[in-house]
Amino acid sequence: MATRRQLANAIRVLAMDSVQKAKSGHPGAPMGMADIAEVLWRDFLKHNPTNPKWADRDRFVLSNGHGSMLIYSLLHLTGYDLSIEDLKQFRQLHSKTPGHPEYGYAPGVETTTGPLGQGITNAVGMAIAEKTLAGQFNREGHEIVDHHTYVFLGDGCLMEGISHEACSLAGTLGLGKLIAFYDDNNISIDGHVDGWFSDDTAERFEAYGWQVIRNVDGHDAEQIRAATILAQAEKGKPTLIICKTIIGFGSPNKSGSHDSHGAPLGDEEIDLTRKALGWEYAPFEIPAEYYAEWSAKEKGAAAEKSWEEKFAAYAKAYPELAAEFKRRVSGELPTNWAAESKAFIEKLQANPASIASRKASQNAIEAYAHVLPEFLGGSADLASSNLTLWSGSKPIRAHENVGGNYINYGVREFGMSAIMNGIALHGGFIPYGATFLMFYEYAHNAVRMAALMKQRTLFVYTHDSIGLGEDGPTHQPVEQTASLRLIPNLETWRPCDQVESAIAWQQAVERQDGPSALIFTRQNLAQMDRTSAQLDAVKRGAYVLKDCDGTPELIFIATGSEVELAVQAAEALSAEGKKVRVVSMPSTNRFDKQDAAYRESVLPAAVTKRVAIEAGIADFWYKYVGFNGRVIGMNSFGESAPADQLFKLFGFTVENVVAKAKEIL
């Protein structure tokens, strides 16, 4: 029988061999954390390699994602559908083993990590989802949701500011099933961290309200095992296990040095490491008895079978809850969703109201949340401004409302966004969270990660332009909406009234292959008249809102608060005998995906005289109006003044729009 160290060495050699074959990568972290991984994955982790999506599996997150060969080795050794050939294709085009772990490639990878700090933050989201789902579905004697979230993280994750945001909230919420292993090796890319990272990490996490287990030898299996048992016993606090490790463990000349962090060890050093570890096998060769010791298939199948028996008893006692649980974790929407959302939208169109689109957003949440118990909302300390609360909101607290549906994220925009990604990845919820559009900047990378992972995360942004007024340019977005539109696989919506707002929410909920950004105003917006055909066309991203007889001479394209301005300018020009079309374009991303025939029907190529109007950066719009068109937008930062004065100052008036249009008519 192989020893624990020998089993851990299987990880080490796979890591160094794969990195060497790829001619790039990070062998140091996998080699340093191999002993911790061996104990966790063989003694504690509840998972089933033959069903990586089992609902009650433990979640494992490698926050220090550059050490990706650690998780790939673990998945391969324990029996997931990840072959030795897949490991040989590490970092190669279209392989299942990209340079950083990517969700959707190798089975068993729970989230895409690499941008440091976001993995631990995703894990906080997963732990929140587990605790909340348990609160909503578990009943006495029937704990169908009962799993841990484990995280590996390093110095880099802890230096990133997002780790403070996430770990502070995790402590406040008492996430007792969140257990983090800190790879305390004192090394980062530039060398020994003493010169730039001298925090007392244990004191820091104790201040957050975590249980901290200090001074664990990360190469002593019994110490690691004892610490993990202690962590599992603490039900009311998350746990940080501080493991003292040696980066590149086993390498005679590069262990304990940044030389092993981010580059292949080299053939000569690998030979020396094999000798030092007593590893007599060829590259990528693992003895059959080692595979047998590592395999989690039998144990995992038994664990899932035991859970299925529990769930059968639960379904017998609570058939409706059981059916709802299965629906929720599958990601399917309720059977009445389509009819209810359609009826709500039609009701809004039939009952005009001139309200701020942020208020329209709240009304949509109110209507849809009654149909969608999977909504898990929140705001970064701006609920009264973002209007994200509804009549049934139940804020989650450490010991109250553990089955609630709303998270007070505090002033943590980046943390909130990455936590929502973790909630979405866990399953069972559709998370939405809000802040001012200007402060999306803090969270940009988490929004990008949601798009990369194709998660149904709903980002809500209010106070969308100079229209917020007196707070001034620090709070007035200019380039932010355009920036969001440029993120691949993110759909951005900027609706013009309560109807488009409700449709934007509807489309975001129904979209299962990526996130959406919903952008709303502070100021009131007039409701537009629409036919049933126009109402149905809103979801296509752009549609003809007002038209003329025959071929138009000019097309106005507008979004959000500027649609009314476009309509008024069109009316003024029409009174002078001009043929003008107004296109409302709430989602450029959605419109760009439409077939060529539809796009031509909205923006005919023959009509080259076009004017775009949006209180955002002007440059974005030339793709729609052409170089000979006109854009009425922002080319500078805003000012501190009442909103009506600012719109006049920056040219958002009927007179200026008409004048610009006449330049090309």
UniProtKB/Swiss-Prot annotation:
Residues with site note (Important for catalytic activity): H26, H261
Residues making up the signal peptide according to the UniProt record: none
Positions contributing to thiamine diphosphate binding: H66, G114, P115, L116, G156, N185, H261, F439
Binding site for Mg(2+): D155, N185, I187
Cofactor: how bound: Binds 1 Mg(2+) ion per subunit. Can also utilize other divalent metal cations, such as Ca(2+), Mn(2+) and Co(2+). Binds 1 thiamine pyrophosphate per subunit.
Top-rank EC class of the record's enzyme: transferase
Record-annotated active site: E413
Gene Ontology CC annotations of this record: cytosol
One GO term (biological process): pentose-phosphate shunt
Cofactor(s) required, per the database record: Mg(2+); Ca(2+); Mn(2+); Co(2+)
A Pfam family assignment: Transketolase_C_1
EC code: 2.2.1.1
Keywords: Calcium, Magnesium, Metal-binding, Thiamine pyrophosphate, Transferase
Catalysed reactions listed for this entry: D-sedoheptulose 7-phosphate + D-glyceraldehyde 3-phosphate = aldehydo-D-ribose 5-phosphate + D-xylulose 5-phosphate
Molecular function (Gene Ontology), one example: transketolase activity
Binding site for substrate: H26, H261, R358, S385, H463, D471, R522
Assembly behavior: Homodimer.
Protein task: Catalyzes the reversible transfer of a two-carbon ketol group from sedoheptulose-7-phosphate to glyceraldehyde-3-phosphate, producing xylulose-5-phosphate and ribose-5-phosphate. Catalyzes the transfer of a two-carbon ketol group from a ketose donor to an aldose acceptor, via a covalent intermediate with the cofactor thiamine pyrophosphate.
NCBIfam families named in the record: tktlase_bact
Protein family according to the UniProt entry: Belongs to the transketolase family.
Name the record gives this protein: Transketolase
Species of origin: Haemophilus influenzae (strain ATCC 51907 / DSM 11121 / KW20 / Rd)
Gene: tktA
